[in-house]
């Protein structure tokens, strides 16, 4: 009998072991859909991005009008741009839900998978930031100026570093050119890191809602979960289509309809909604270097999750106290997001400071303590 090509061919074998015959826990819930949804998001963003890059000009005098030209004169250019801009928002929604799932179900105990995931998040944030600068609107320009300027808080080398990043003494043509180069390159780096992320995941196999070993129960990924992921994809692409077709500018900033002007500062400089929680943490500390460190810590704190796990149970499924804290953390992040969008005045300053404090306290102190307390209660 001839060997099955799907299982013997060097390339098809890899696809087969990752997407078809992959042994999967039978009880994984819809929260496990987000990995594949992120893959779909990445492919969508790369395709729409490539089409946009064909019509974009990375020059300060032409960038804004080239984007306008794409929307007005290119066949379906408006749709491609709207899908790309709103696809980024959907990408971040999926990423945050994916990370939330990892925190809730103790997936961070697969350390290599978790750490590559955080590196992926950082790369994604960098990609989104440099991409936001490209349309060269007011908020693009001032967002780039404010965020790159933060590097000047680094002692001794800060100012040199900023000028090196800018390619001059302010955000100008060289900055735009290099940001376009980076925005083109980084998604392919993300695709490469995704393969590493999956390689580490498939070494251990997926976690499941009970957090117990499920080797004896596993079922093939296809057709069970390929079909389930297809439903997830439909449920994700529908809001994207609705957003891109009916309210394409709902998540954008009105300032970006004005071409960049270094002489006029917008009244409220703020990033896209998916960075607002980190922006609120940055603003909550009156000292520049302190703010930058807090901003970095707000994301890098995820690296500590495996070491802060004190419970004898992996997931929070049967740990009501930890569940309460987890949802407290979610609410906390929503408050930070809201505060980040508000002007720097009373009462938003104090709310932001309190929310920043409780964010770090919950992750570093309360969750580990609660895990240890639950061990005691359960007589472990």
From Swiss-Prot:
| Amino acids binding heme b b562 | 84, 183
- Mainly resides where? mitochondrion
Q: How is the cofactor bound?
A: Binds 2 heme b groups non-covalently.
Q: Which cofactor does it need?
A: heme b
Protein name, UniProt field: Cytochrome b
Q: Which organism is it from?
A: Herpetotheres cachinnans (Laughing falcon)
- Family (UniProt): Belongs to the cytochrome b family.
Recorded hits in CDD domains, A to Z, give: cytochrome_b_C (cd00290), Cytochrome_b_N (cd00284)
Q: What does this protein do?
A: Component of the ubiquinol-cytochrome c reductase complex (complex III or cytochrome b-c1 complex) that is part of the mitochondrial respiratory chain. The b-c1 complex mediates electron transfer from ubiquinol to cytochrome c. Contributes to the generation of a proton gradient across the mitochondrial membrane that is then used for ATP synthesis.
- Location in or out of the cell: Mitochondrion inner membrane
